[in-house]
Amino acid sequence: MFQDIGPYVFHNEYSSRKPEEDDILIVQKGRDILMNCGQTLPTVAQVRAVCSLAAEQAYYLLSIDEKHFFCTDVQVPETENLSYTSVMILREMNPGYMGFGGSVSWQLASWYDLHRYCGRCGTKTEHSERERAIICPKCGHTYYPRISPVVIIAIVDGDRILLTRYNRGGYRRHSLVAGFVEIGETLEDAVRREVMEEVGLHVKDIRYCESQPWPFSSSLIAGFFADVDGDPTVHLNTDGQDELAEGVWVSRDELVLEDSGMSLTWDMIRKFKEKHPISTIA
Ligand SMILES: [Zn+2]
């Protein structure tokens, strides 16, 4: 999956290290990120070639082996080589470990960007020098990176799995029922609620399968299998922007794997296809 970058090793522990010329520099602008000819993430040196960037204006984020990622809130102008493009380009980046490191870096850079002022008292915030945190110098509130949990559910009815298709975005592959966990819910509550809301089914024997960090929505996705309980007739939710366009039962034999295996969704669908024990027994 996307986060499986071995033999490279991901290091997310905080460090106060300073940037060097060949370190990677993440410059985010909303959901866009600065890229080199649309191909690679720029280095500190490449950005310094077009604008001034003092060492204290770059903040350490993470490392993959000896490749260090920093971000800055300096406004970097576009040039012939440097331009802003959708962060989603990193999902398919080659090599994959740079796509993963770049997107988690973008997630952190976005979090810093969204917390430039204290949400409680409006004072300009500061970066902690001891840990990955943002501190308000006036009221003392400390902000830590926030992760939004999501559940993805593979609903099974004997030898069939329920595949869905959403109307949102440009993503046209099949998917599984999914949604954010709401305040006050357990993961299992969220599974039952999302399934009922999206496809009008009751489920039982909810079982955890695996998880995936998903930087593009600052999420941690938890994948579950669940068996349909009672009538398997699908009633699609057709309200709202995230309405489902399709919800179909597909048998193991007819199931075609549409994805290279980057996403948890398709890893779970593959597990069903290959009769992984978690997909077949409750
Ligand atoms: Zn404050």
Predicted segments with their positions:
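Unchanged
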Residues: L53-E92, V181-A282
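N-terminal alpha-helical interaction blocks
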Residues: M1-G96, P277-A282
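Residue-level detector of short, conserved catalytic/binding motifs and their immediate flanks
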Residues: D22-I24, V151, A222
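Cys/His-rich short segments
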Residues: S103-A154
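Short, charged surface segments at domain edges that flank catalytic/cofactor-binding sites
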Residues: E92-S103, Q107
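A generic structural signal for well-ordered coil/turn residues at beta-strand boundaries
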Residues: L114, P149, D157-G158, G170, ...
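Short, well-ordered strand-loop elements centered on a beta-strand within folded domains, enriched
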Residues: D32-N36, K67-D73, R160-R165, L176, ...
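N-terminal strand-loop-strand
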Residues: Q28-K29, A133-L176, F180, H202-V203, ...
